Amino acid sequence: MRISKPHLRSVSIQCYLCLLLNSHFLTEAGIHVFILGCFSAGLPKTEANWVNVISDLKKIEDLIQSMHIDATLYTESDVHPSCKVTAMKCFLLELQVISHESGDTDIHDTVENLIILANNILSSNGNITESGCKECEELEEKNIKEFLQSFVHIVQMFINTS
């Protein structure tokens, strides 16, 4: 079973390590290990998180196969690399439409997890300002299948540049 919040995996591993090495914290070397462990818990692990985002997108795609959701979503199909953050924010907003339209708890939970992962990655990159990009409402409306394919494409753009 996959942990639904993979960004917490490294923290839990480091907590176990802390308990294991607890008796050694009385030495100077033990204190250094503890401090370095605390710092490493906060370091971004963007490549792994983007892979988890793609995994969640595939899960959403599988879950909606059995449903009939007749929604059109604003979709950026030809993302310029200088507008990928703006496009990603639009995709994340439209994901909430899928969650609402489906009414399915599995889809809702997967969408929430995906949004948390993506927002954590985007926030770890700092505040990037992009100009000359289309607003979400200016994008072409497409069906859910095309939306998810375009979403995977933009996530792969983030993976390839990290």
From Swiss-Prot:
Highest taxon above the source species: Eukaryota
Entry's localization field: Secreted
Keywords noted in UniProt: Cytokine, Disulfide bond, Glycoprotein, Secreted, Signal
SUPFAM superfamilies noted in UniProt: 4-helical cytokines
InterPro entries per record: 4_helix_cytokine-like_core (IPR009079), IL-15 (IPR020439), IL-15/IL-21_fam (IPR003443), IL-15_mml (IPR020466)
Covalent S-S links between cysteines: C83-C133, C90-C136
Residues bearing carbohydrate: N127
The keyword Lipoprotein belongs to this UniProt entry's keyword annotation: no
Main location: secreted
Annotated signal sequence range: 1-29
Protein purpose: Cytokine that plays a major role in the development of inflammatory and protective immune responses to microbial invaders and parasites by modulating immune cells of both the innate and adaptive immune systems. Stimulates the proliferation of natural killer cells, T-cells and B-cells and promotes the secretion of several cytokines. In monocytes, induces the production of IL8 and monocyte chemotactic protein 1/CCL2, two chemokines that attract neutrophils and monocytes respectively to sites of infection.
Record-given protein name: Interleukin-15
Organism of provenance: Macaca mulatta (Rhesus macaque)
Gene designation per UniProt: IL15
